[in-house]
């Protein structure tokens, strides 16, 4: 199996996740080629069994570079894709001290739904989606993030 992994990491968290994913999949005999979206053309994707897209979340959306990359994507119809994002961890409300509920988080964190909409609009088929939380604006990644990446890798059929 061949996986092409496209990320838009700005502060290095996405690169860490991509490298960990590639390492986990290599142990299963899967080849993973990791690319930053600035280094490849959305119009000339290399052939692959699975395309994986990863973007950090900014203000609840994928960063602009990734949105533009996905809008200009020229992918084969019916190609399989997965999404693995890095998003800010929910912070307690300053007045009440309570963490937002999952419903409230889903209302404001729209990274995966926006990316899915763009990719399915390009004729691709979703295989899996997941997220790894970042504890600060520039990192670090949450404790136990490697286990999340491993579980995500397990969700992808080899």
Residue spans for each PLM region:
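Iron-sulfur (Fe-S) cluster-binding modules
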Residues: 1, 36
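N-terminal beta1-alpha1 ligand-phosphate binding loop
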Residues: 2-28
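Cofactor-binding loop segments of dinucleotide-utilizing enzymes, especially the Rossmann-like FAD-
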Residues: 8-10, 37, 86
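Flexible, glycine-rich phosphate/dinucleotide-binding loops
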Residues: 12, 41, 90-92
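FMN-binding flavodoxin-like domain, especially the glycine-rich phosphate-binding loop
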Residues: 16, 24-28, 33, 47-158
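Short active-site-proximal "capping" loops at secondary-structure junctions
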Residues: 39-41, 58
